[in-house]
């Protein structure tokens, strides 16, 4: 999910349990194929019956008919919009790996170390779940990048992305527990211009995407709670290209620097150096691109989008190290404003607090809503539209009561100063024992 704000904005840490192959999205040829074969044609045999016997009047021989071969299903490819479940596209449910990056320096030995390679093979189920989620994300976002246009409502864009994710994972999330098996890892964020993160339309929202907007598209897909968190930025005016390029470069720098035993502070310093080497000209004025210093990347635990570790995007962060087996969302945010965000606008994102202390609830609406959240989302983030989709109504009083009781955490939109523009790029990486895998990498970014 978008960013994990640092101490002054993050009310509490959520602690939980915890590729396109080689950067290319798979082609239709990689999908499970079954060549279509035409039915056997017996016309050639029509005149082949033997003539009647001579003087002996032998009986006419019967024509031998060839048995018809059954047609095999044609090669399956993804539809537009994406609606074909991934399980139907990949033989044996083996999904493309992400970008594989060998460790460097003191960790170089891990690439060939037999023990580390053995440990890596032990993680196959874990990796296949992540790779499936990543392939869902790639196929959905690549269609979205082609079709998002000015004039669309944010609701139309968000629901289109979310419907595709649910279809490709094979989990519509309308039955109790189904969304916990797969589907949306968190709501589709569509944060525009000075708003950097955590904005998705609530019911009745009429906001329309404009030609001059800069929109961050941040959504997650999960399989069995293995959340793939990846984001990109859409802008139609090339004047914003340097801003987008700065943030993309910073994110790739963070990915390059990340690794086992690497300190978070070192990653943040490298990200800031890359980001702030850019500037963008708007209306004749040069603006330095600034890191949004109180937004961070984060580790991801099963069913928990924000784990206990943060990845800063500026220098001076803590000395915590990344560890073997961890999963991180490396995300960076750049701004033409102050480079600092505050809570603003109407809240749409929420999540159950893992291991929250029991609190007696007096409102029956709060009790009923908590039951719905537990059965349908667990600790996965959700938004008001998701409650509407489940048929819930008149739930705001109960929802606010759960927030004030510390059972549910709200995530208001995070915004820089009005008139500024912000951009975001993000990938999920897995620190495997022998290599680093950029699980969500595609040929788009």
Swiss-Prot record:
GO biological process: one example: proteolysis
Positions bound to a divalent metal cation 1: 218, 229, 426
One Gene Ontology CC term in the entry: cytoplasm
The organism's place on the tree of life at top rank: Eukaryota
Intracellular or extracellular location(s): Cytoplasm
Binding site for a divalent metal cation 2: 229, 298, 331, 426
Gene3D superfamilies, sorted: Creatinase/methionine aminopeptidase superfamily, Winged helix-like DNA-binding domain superfamily/Winged helix DNA-binding domain
Positions of region (Disordered): 1-86
Enzyme class: hydrolase
UniProt feature, compositional bias: Acidic residues: 34-46
InterPro entries: Creatinase/aminopeptidase-like, Met_Aminopeptidase_Type2, Pept_M24, Pept_M24_MAP, Pept_M24A_MAP2, Pept_M24A_MAP2_BS, WH-like_DNA-bd_sf, WH_DNA-bd_sf
Ranges of compositional bias, category Basic residues: 59-74
Catalysis performed (reactions): Release of N-terminal amino acids, preferentially methionine, from peptides and arylamides
Co-factor: note: Binds 2 divalent metal cations per subunit. Has a high-affinity and a low affinity metal-binding site. The true nature of the physiological cofactor is under debate. The enzyme is active with cobalt, zinc, manganese or divalent iron ions. Most likely, methionine aminopeptidases function as mononuclear Fe(2+)-metalloproteases under physiological conditions, and the catalytically relevant metal-binding site has been assigned to the histidine-containing high-affinity site.
Protein name in the entry: Methionine aminopeptidase 2-1
């Amino acid at each position: 999910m978008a960013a994990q704000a640092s101490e002054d904005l993050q009310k509490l840490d959520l602690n939980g349990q915890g590729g396109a192959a080689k950067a290319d999205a798979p082609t239709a040829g990689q999908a499970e194929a079954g060549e279509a074969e035409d039915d056997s044609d017996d016309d050639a045999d029509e005149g082949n019956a033997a003539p009647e016997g001579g003087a002996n009047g032998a009986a006419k021989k019967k024509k031998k008919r060839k048995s018809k071969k059954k047609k095999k299903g044609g090669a399956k490819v993804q539809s537009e919009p994406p609606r074909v479940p991934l399980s139907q596209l990949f033989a044996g449910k083996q999904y493309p790996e992400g970008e594989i990056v060998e460790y460097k320096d003191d960790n170089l030995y891990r690439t060939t170390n037999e023990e580390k390679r053995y440990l890596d093979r032990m993680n196959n189920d874990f990796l296949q779940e992540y790779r499936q989620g990543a392939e869902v994300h790639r196929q959905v976002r690549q269609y979205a990048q082609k079709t998002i246009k000015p004039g669309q409502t944010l609701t139309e864009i968000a629901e289109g992305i979310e419907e595709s994710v649910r279809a490709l994972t094979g989990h519509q999330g309308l039955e109790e527990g189904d969304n916990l098996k797969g589907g949306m890892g968190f709501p589709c964020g569509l944060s525009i211009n000075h708003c950097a993160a955590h904005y998705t339309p609530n019911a009745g929202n009429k906001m329309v995407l404009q030609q001059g907007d800069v929109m961050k598209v941040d959504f997650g897909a999960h399989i069995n709670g293995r959340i793939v968190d990846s984001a990109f930025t859409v802008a139609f005016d090339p004047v914003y290209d340097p801003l987008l390029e700065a943030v993309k470069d910073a994110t790739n720098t963070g990915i390059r620097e990340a690794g086992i035993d690497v300190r978070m502070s070192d990653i943040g310093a490298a990200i800031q150096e890359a980001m702030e080497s850019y500037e963008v000209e708007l209306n004749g004025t040069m603006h330095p691109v600034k890191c949004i210093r109180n937004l961070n990347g984060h580790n991801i635990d099963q069913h928990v989008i924000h784990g206990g570790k943060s990845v800063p995007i500026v220098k001076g962060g803590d000395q915590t190290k990344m560890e073997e087996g961890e999963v991180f969302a490396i995300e960076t945010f750049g701004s033409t404003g102050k480079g600092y965000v505050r809570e603003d606008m109407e809240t749409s994102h929420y999540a159950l607090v893992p291991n929250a202390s029991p609190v007696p609830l007096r409102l029956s609406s709060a009790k009923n809503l908590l039951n719905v959240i537990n059965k349908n989302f667990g600790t996965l983030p959700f938004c008001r539209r998701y409650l509407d989709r489940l048929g819930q109504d008149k739930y705001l009083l109960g929802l606010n009561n759960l927030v004030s009781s510390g059972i549910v955490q709200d995530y208001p939109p995070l915004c820089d100063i009005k008139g500024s523009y912000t951009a975001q790029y993000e990938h999920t990486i897995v620190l495997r024992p022998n290599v680093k895998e950029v699980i969500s990498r595609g040929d788009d970014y």
